């Protein structure tokens, strides 16, 4: 999945650059510029659909990558793991600020609700929110800075990816048995390159199918309506890949408690290398750990479903 994530990153940067060439980061023009792209720009509809659905595949790959790392004990490469968690946080931030850019109803209200969570921080909360917004509500300055961040963060992500790979190169990658694989090493090409092409094709086919046949399947219909600060949508919710965290946030009545639980649901990954007590690295021969692992997976799927 690491290779697939790299491919996702390249696809997102290339399609994103092409979209940025036609996009206008202004509240009065943003929605119209996206509509113009889909109607008048050569293959603009396809580029936009690939970019929007590419984000979903990016998250599918990163969640599978993290799940596999948990299952096979890859978190014992502490530096690689911690940079991986920082990469996840960067990806989440990038996806969030990018969701605001088309300036539809859910873009606007999603930005308002999520940035407003900073106000739960004692003493500095309200100041922080107003500083983030560039005013007293989500408006033109917010859109401008969010687009700037959305343009910048993928390159930060690419830099962190190189650091991630550098630390991985120190130890070598892990495998299902969780034992050193020095004696089993084989040439990268043609063995791994062939294996990777299979994964690439298996990801590309569903992505292209989704982008061509049902590009709006995972999007929110509210985003076909231009942002209107005077009309609140009946259900404010983020994209599907944030729903598990959003369910945790919404399930706690206290605002600060919800924000802390939301943050903890992702930041708990930093603790995992310190919680490993088994003499075996991988879960291959640990049935009780396997039960806990699959319970976690079921939990995340149920949270996503409930939140939807």
UniProtKB/Swiss-Prot annotation:
User: What are the record keywords, sorted?
Assistant: Electron transport, Heme, Iron, Membrane, Metal-binding, Mitochondrion, Mitochondrion inner membrane, Respiratory chain, Transmembrane, Transmembrane helix, Transport, Ubiquinone
What does the record note about the cofactor?
A: Binds 2 heme b groups non-covalently.
Residues that bind heme b b562, according to the entry? 51, 150
The residues that hold a ubiquinone are 169
Cofactors that this protein relies on = heme b
Name one cellular component (GO) term. Answer: mitochondrial inner membrane
Annotated compartments? Mitochondrion inner membrane
Q: Give binding positions for heme b b566.
A: 65, 164
Q: Which domain of life is it from?
A: Eukaryota
* Any single biological process term in GO: mitochondrial electron transport, ubiquinol to cytochrome c
- Per the record's keyword annotation, is Iron included, yes or no? yes
Q: Kindly name one Pfam family recorded for this protein.
A: Cytochrome_B
Residues that span the membrane, as ranges: 1-21, 45-66, 81-101, 146-166, 194-214, 256-276, 288-308
Task: Identify the main location.
Answer: mitochondrion
Query: GO molecular function of the protein, one example?
Result: ubiquinol-cytochrome-c reductase activity
Membrane topology category? Multi-pass membrane protein
For this protein, the record's InterPro entries field holds: Cyt_b/b6_C, Cyt_b/b6_C_sf, Cyt_b/b6_N, Cytb/b6-like_sf, Cytochrome_b_C_euk/bac, Cytochrome_b_N_euk/bac, Di-haem_cyt_TM
Query: CDD domains of this UniProt entry?
Result: cytochrome_b_C, Cytochrome_b_N
Q: What does this protein do?
A: Component of the ubiquinol-cytochrome c reductase complex (complex III or cytochrome b-c1 complex) that is part of the mitochondrial respiratory chain. The b-c1 complex mediates electron transfer from ubiquinol to cytochrome c. Contributes to the generation of a proton gradient across the mitochondrial membrane that is then used for ATP synthesis.
Membership in a protein family: Belongs to the cytochrome b family.
Subunit info?
The cytochrome bc1 complex contains 11 subunits: 3 respiratory subunits (MT-CYB, CYC1 and UQCRFS1), 2 core proteins (UQCRC1 and UQCRC2) and 6 low-molecular weight proteins (UQCRH/QCR6, UQCRB/QCR7, UQCRQ/QCR8, UQCR10/QCR9, UQCR11/QCR10 and a cleavage product of UQCRFS1). This cytochrome bc1 complex then forms a dimer.
**Additional info?**
Heme 1 (or BL or b562) is low-potential and absorbs at about 562 nm, and heme 2 (or BH or b566) is high-potential and absorbs at about 566 nm.
**Mind telling me what this protein is named?**
Cytochrome b
